[in-house]
Structures are given as C-alpha cells and as structure tokens.
Amino acid sequence: MKSLKELSLRIKNIRSVQKTTKIMQMVSAAKLLQSQKKLLNSKLYVSKLHNIIFSLMLSVDQELLAKILNVSNDGSYLVFIIASDRGLCGNFNSSIVKFSQERVNKSIANGKKVDIVFLGKKAFDVGKNRFDSKSILKIENSKGITLKHVEALVDGIDLSKYDKVKVFYSKFYNTFTQKPMLETIKPWSKDSSLIDSSLAGPTTDYGYEYEPQNIEFILKSLVQDYVVIALYSALLESATSENSARMVAMESANRNTKEILNKLALLYNRSRQAAITTDLIEVIGGAESL
C-alpha cells in the first residue's frame, strides 16, 4: 500500500489536472457558442449563393453549362484536409485523416494526380506519411483563418489546372455528433453537404435581370466565388466540430478525475486509519509491557 505522503501528493496533482480540464471545458464551451453563430451565418450565405447559382443554371442550355462548369474526369485533383492545430479533442483529428486517407489513396491508385493542402497542424502531423501524394502543403492556425485568408489562399492557387477540388472536413450536427465529410467544390454540384435547404429557400427561376447582360460571365464569377465561400464554410464546420469535441473530451476528463479522486480519497482514509490503528496497537503493546 502506498504511503500517506505519496497518496497526498497524487491527490494534489490530480486536483491540479482537474482545474486545468475544467478551465479548458469552459473555454471550449464559450468558443463553441461563438463558432456556432459564425457557422449559422456562413451556412445561410452559402445556401443562398448555392440556390442562386442553381436558379441561374435553369436558364442555361446544357452546352453552355458544361463549358461554365468545365466538367472533366481527367487531369489532377486538389484536396483540402481540414483538422485542428491542437490536440485534446478526442479522435477529431485522427478520424478525418483516416477518412480522407482511404479516399485520396484510392484516387491516386486509379491514376489521378492529387495535390494535398493540410489546413491544421495536427492534420499534417498525423497524415504526412499516410498519403501517397508527393505534393503536400501545410497551413497552420486553420481555426483562425478568416474569409480574407481563404480568398488569398485560393487566389494563390491556380485552380484552372485542377479538374476537381475536394474538401475533407468534420461536419457539425450537434454537441455529441460530428462526422467526417467529403465535399466537391469544383466543379459546382447541385448536391452539397454544406448547405441547408431550409435556409436556402425554394429553388426556382426568379427571372433575374443581369448586369452585365452576360449570364456566362455572371455564372463563372459566382461559381468562382462559391469555391471560396464553400471552403470557408467547411473551415467553420470543422472549427465548430473541434470546439464541441474538445468540450466533450474535457467533460469526460473531469468525470474521470472525479472518480479517481474519490477512489484515492477512500484509499487515503483507509491508509490513514490503518496507520492510526498500528500506532494504537504499538502504544497499547508498549503500555502492557511496562
């Protein structure tokens, strides 16, 4: 049995850890509320933009539409993998890397050239040796990236040389549910995991008046804008999922430390009682020998 001094020191250390996890849980809860508000605004915007693009496409013939979307199965892919810069959030980082690894390596095995951009230090640390791609870029502080940063990032990449641009991210459903998701943001698709149909409104041709009166120019511009907005929205989804995962992980850690402290307190009291009993026996034994 451990000494009272050892047990006392261990209880002190675990209480210190418990204070840290409680603070981290509170901070994560506050960040979760903030990121949820940003995510809702972003989801509203991307849903409306997606709906406008689809509505405009209703008035475009298929030949022009194919030209605007530039759909092709050849060439190369650009893949964004979004995770976190920090740990202590359960399997948040490992799950998105595992999810993307299977799909990216399958594309490479099928002869596709895939360039990878890791948005988040942990995504790079976990996944840098798991992908068969030789072209890998790492961008840290993904959760702090603003819309301007995303615009600069996209502007710095020649998207025209990629037939497909894909985003792997963690979709936020609720506090306890976040799932790895794959979203293709180029070419534009009618189906999207980033939009909320209840926010987008009805899909119909509203009879827009175009300025300039060149629907091809307008659609190309909107589709390019959609790539930026969709990537930014995916970043917000992942940031919200990360904060939620960390809050839940810290809550679980708090419960575990509480259970450990209860067990240690019980063990400490038993050890203390045993020590007192031993001392009493020695005192009584000494008195009887007199």
From Swiss-Prot:
It holds the Pfam family ATP-synt. GO terms for cellular component: plasma membrane; proton-transporting ATP synthase complex. This is ATP synthase gamma chain. One of its GO terms (molecular function) is ATP binding. It is found in: Cell membrane. The keyword Hydrolase does not apply. One of its GO terms (biological process) is proton motive force-driven plasma membrane ATP synthesis. Belongs to the ATPase gamma chain family. F-type ATPases have 2 components, CF(1) - the catalytic core - and CF(0) - the membrane proton channel. CF(1) has five subunits: alpha(3), beta(3), gamma(1), delta(1), epsilon(1). CF(0) has three main subunits: a, b and c. It is a peripheral membrane protein. Its main location: membrane. Produces ATP from ADP in the presence of a proton gradient across the membrane. The gamma chain is believed to be important in regulating ATPase activity and the flow of protons through the CF(0) complex. InterPro entries: ATP_synth_F1_ATPase_gsu, ATP_synth_F1_gsu. Transmembrane segments: none annotated. Keywords: ATP synthesis, Cell membrane, CF(1), Hydrogen ion transport, Ion transport, Membrane, Transport. The keyword Methyltransferase does not apply.
